[in-house]
Curated annotation (Swiss-Prot):
Homology family: Belongs to the WD repeat WDR24 family.
Positions of modified residues (Phosphoserine): S155, S470, S496, S594, S598
Protein name: GATOR2 complex protein WDR24
GO MF: ubiquitin protein ligase activity; zinc ion binding
Pathway(s) annotated for this protein in UniProt: Protein modification; protein ubiquitination
EC number: 2.3.2.27
Amino acid sequence: MEKMSRVTTALGGSVLTGRTMHCHLDAPANAISVCRDAAQVVVAGRSIFKIYAIEEEQFVEKLNLRVGRKPSLNLSCADVVWHQMDENLLATAATNGVVVTWNLGRPSRNKQDQLFTEHKRTVNKVCFHPTEAHVLLSGSQDGFMKCFDLRRKDSVSTFSGQSESVRDVQFSIRDYFTFASTFENGNVQLWDIRRPDRCERMFTAHNGPVFCCDWHPEDRGWLATGGRDKMVKVWDMTTHRAKEMHCVQTIASVARVKWRPECRHHLATCSMMVDHNIYVWDVRRPFVPAAMFEEHRDVTTGIAWRHPHDPSFLLSGSKDSSLCQHLFRDASQPVERANPEGLCYGLFGDLAFAAKESLVAAESGRKPYTGDRRHPIFFKRKLDPAEPFAGLASSALSVFETEPGGGGMRWFVDTAERYALAGRPLAELCDHNAKVARELGRNQVAQTWTMLRIIYCSPGLVPTANLNHSVGKGGSCGLPLMNSFNLKDMAPGLGSETRLDRSKGDARSDTVLLDSSATLITNEDNEETEGSDVPADYLLGDVEGEEDELYLLDPEHAHPEDPECVLPQEAFPLRHEIVDTPPGPEHLQDKADSPHVSGSEADVASLAPVDSSFSLLSVSHALYDSRLPPDFFGVLVRDMLHFYAEQGDVQMAVSVLIVLGERVRKDIDEQTQEHWYTSYIDLLQRFRLWNVSNEVVKLSTSRAVSCLNQASTTLHVNCSHCKRPMSSRGWVCDRCHRCASMCAVCHHVVKGLFVWCQGCSHGGHLQHIMKWLEGSSHCPAGCGHLCEYS
């Protein structure tokens, strides 16, 4: 539903009139740009390149620049810009690396003017000089920026950022020779177009790629940047070092940022993924947007204010194949729906609570704050309802500190430092982490690690030490669970299909259910008895312990060297009366070498005590390997990880993700994993656990997280002869013209891993130095020092 409010703005000799409206495009848009008279807008994408007139009630298509029968990659646009001095001049950045200029004044249908094919990869951004009509700047995925003079066929200068791909370039509005560029590795560089050999300034602005930047139209040194770290930062470039003035935290990666005209502290942003809305922020209030536009149903790819002196109209293009004009007055204001109370936990468990002064005063009986009344009320300026600060407000802040010794976050630090996340078999990792959690008093976490070991490890990998059973009253003995029981001196007189009879309704809790007079029934009528119907030999169930397992009675596999444990006879309570009295022990001993008796040969068999020393059990091997596959528990493990994350224990969620790896990764979406990883890494860095943080990044199963160590890293190299910084060229000093980092063996520049002696400071390629020191202990540089490689 289109909103019908209308705004008329007088700008010099022209008048802008319009309302909130949109039109459907033939294809998704990648970028938009507005003509200098604010009457037309150009929309460019992979399959669209059109100019629309902005009329009072609607958009009207004026010109389709995709002409010709054959489709060309030169028309597949990643960016478009309309010259602000010449209304007939446009430039596009093609996905095949070509920069194309267009002259709308040409009489033919084809308006294409010039093609520049010097870039080797996709061109991400093109930008005209704000005051020089013939200067065009481009930034490409190949890491180079090129400055073109439209009166020539080739570029006049090339700028190399010595970095990864260039994401955005913008000429400064106030400084004639200055432009800013943003890079994939999180750096921002400032260049002078007269000096293409080196940048004037470089600093790390974001943790990850910097997708966009924009110079402030009024303040000379203000530069806004947005990146994948979901932040918008405002930098003061007038100081010796770039100073961060404001930081706005958004909910998704920032794809575009544009300062709002005539509003010094307002800027508009849109996201690269997930979030489809457009936000207008007041950088002085970075937590709640001043305005929000919700018209698009897919990712917004381009935004532009309609006129450089009109803050009321914002144009946008989207992947939902729509072009919209937003009226600022029609925007929703999230501050009206925001919770007026704030709650936050500190690093060490302190709790801060902020609420409106009026609410706190009502509870405590104090008089609420009424604002500054030094000036009469009739001098008060009437505020615009569109402004985010509509009135005076005051909040009360309460801080609740944790009691000394009453908890804290020491467990978090100890757990992070002691957890084992890699380098061992899965069973050992789970056991180690369970032990750590148990020693720290976190029994639920310890039990979770134990269950993960049981689910994902085969029975043979489970240590027997943790699965011993306490039997009898007089003491305890170790009976490894994953083995079968062998009754000492027991004759093999029971059939292979004999099953243990469990009486229905028998309430058994903490007793060992191997009765000296327990009856084994082989009747076919025993199908309704409780227990397992697995076709095995003799089943023995309900042994007291941590798990309820079934075991095989196999006298042929008895091992005399197995550890045995004497079980007192009173440990086996009588279950029921003996159905039939079997022959005595002597009879069983006489037939110890006879074959097993089948079910047809003996209808009823029983186990009778031989003497007081008969209750000897030993363990040899598992009953059967019929286990539920680990994938069966995937949903359960996923819910468990979500439970810990929702409880605030993101440490447990990330640790399990790393330890289980691909076993559980497929059950949790990539965005959730990335959120858990970044939250845990942020906590580790707050506690200054840098080594653990680095290990988590290296072991991460999320691609977006594992590349964090490869970004925002700057290595400063000085010449080893004259000590001059070598920032412009990689390996040659500008002053003494000598190469740095020469290998003492091959006398070539080392451009990779460099190893040197701490005694004499000579070194070279790692493999060369290792091979040299295998045959000689003296330095290869000839200094006479005895070097050693360790």
